[in-house]
């Protein structure tokens, strides 16, 4: 679960590699959410950014940045993922 992994990583591991893996997982969740809402599978994340919410766009953009070798801002990126995953749980979406 992304939420649990994020909390554990923020408190204990503080691993950039774990954070990157969590963002990769989150990108698949965003893709699934978009499919559920639109009934249209969007393969490319660059296209997915155009049909998702602001928070989900942020998750995709951070993941793409990390995937392309971008710098990790551990605190900021962890907080963004934590807030997004918490919100998805409250809304009732499985993570």
Name every feature range the model reports, one short phrase each.
Residues 1-95:
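Conserved nucleotidyltransferase catalytic core and NTase-mimicking acidic/glycine-rich helix/loop elements
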């Amino acid at each position: 679960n992304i939420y649990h992994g994020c909390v554990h990583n923020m408190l204990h591991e503080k691993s950039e590699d774990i954070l990157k893996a969590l963002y990769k997982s989150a990108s698949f969740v965003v893709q699934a959410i978009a499919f559920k809402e639109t009934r249209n599978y969007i393969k490319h994340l660059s296209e997915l950014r155009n049909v998702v919410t602001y928070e989900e766009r942020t998750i995709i953009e951070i993941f793409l940045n990390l995937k392309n070798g971008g710098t990790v801002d551990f605190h900021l990126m962890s907080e963004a993922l934590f807030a997004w995953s918490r919100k998805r749980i409250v809304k009732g979406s499985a993570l």
